[in-house]
Amino acid sequence: MQSAAASGTLEQRSQAVVDGLEAIDPRFVLYLPSSTLKLVLTHFLPGGPGHQPGRHVFPIPREEEGISILSGLALAGQRAVMIFQDNGIGNLLTALLTFPQPYHLPVFGIVTRRGGLGEYNSMIHTISERTEALLDAAGVRWFQLDARTPLGDWAATIERAYTFASTTHRPVFVLVNLMGG
């Protein structure tokens, strides 16, 4: 098992995600509010250091609506990212598999992991433990960032995953465990 120093603290992991997102320089940041994502989201919200003119940051009510918005932004050639929890993967599959996937749209998401080590909410485990299998079954490419990944690689992996989505013209998600598991 890796030590806390190897995997970093919540603050360090969140900052690594922020650094990766800033390297992408998204013009649109869509998100579902989450206490797990607080440090990442407050960076981009008004008053945060990542808030800037021309960057549109807004909450979305459901994951599938985020996929629709991301698809439109991809068609318009805009850099965009959606940030949400893995327990929302089930909600977005129909939207994902009927528009951006078959029409080769490079939608990109940062998906925070729930249900692993350090999870405090027992009901989350059932859906979250199946995230990778659901994405694999749907043919969606994903990359994993957790305690096994050196913290120094997180930002570059996020940036490369975004480039991968743009190059391959398909949806890509980065699964990020901010809770340390």
Segments from the language model and where they lie:
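Thiamine diphosphate
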Residues: 1-181
